Amino acid sequence: MSNTLRPYLNAVRSTLTASLALEEFSSEIVERQSQPEVEVGRSPEILLKPLVVSRNEQEQCLIESSVNSVRFSIRIKQVDEIERILVRKFMQFLMGRAESFFILRRKPVQGYDISFLITNYHTEEMLKHKLVDFIIEFMEEVDAEISEMKLFLNGRARLVAETYLSCF
C-alpha cells in the first residue's frame, strides 16, 4: 500500500464512522413508512452537507448523510484508457451482483464509479465498525485489483507483440 493511500483511507474511515450516527425516521409524507432520505431528498432540513474526501483529482469519495441514511460514493483513480476500461467493467461486474452486497447500489451517483447506501436498518442489523471496515477493505482491494489487472494486461500485450514481431 502506498504512503499516500493510508492517510486517505484513515480520513475516509473517520468521516464515515462519524456519518453513521443514524436513527429511525418515519416518512413525513407516507404514514408508517421509512425511506432513505438521502435518496428521496424531499426534506432539505433532514439532509446534511455532503462531504468530499479527496486523495487527488481522480480519486475521491462523496459522503452524503441524512438522519436515517448515508450514501457513500467512490471515484476510482483512472489515469489512462486501460484503467478506465478496467474500472468500468469491474464496477459493472460488481453492480450486476448488488443483491449479494446488502449496501451496494445498482447505479452509482453521477460522476462516481460505485455507490453504497447504508440505512439505519443496516446499522441496527450489522456492526457499524464492521461496515466501515468492509468499505475501507473494499477500497484497498479494488485499488490493488485494478493495478494487478493492468500489470497482467500490459504483460500479456507485450508477449503478444513480441510473438507477432518475431515472425518478421
Curated annotation (Swiss-Prot):
User: Gene for this protein?
Assistant: arc4
Q: Drop me one GO molecular function for this one.
A: actin filament binding
The protein's assembly and partners:
Component of the Arp2/3 complex composed of arp2, act2, arc1/p41-ARC, arc2/p34-ARC, arc3/p21-ARC, arc4/p20-ARC and arc5/p16-ARC.
- Where in the cell is the protein located? Cytoplasm, Cytoskeleton, Actin patch
Question: Which source organism?
Answer: Schizosaccharomyces pombe (strain 972 / ATCC 24843)
Cytoplasm among keywords: yes
What name does this protein carry?
Actin-related protein 2/3 complex subunit 4
InterPro entries membership: ARPC2/4 (IPR034666), ARPC4 (IPR008384)
An example GO biological process term is: Arp2/3 complex-mediated actin nucleation
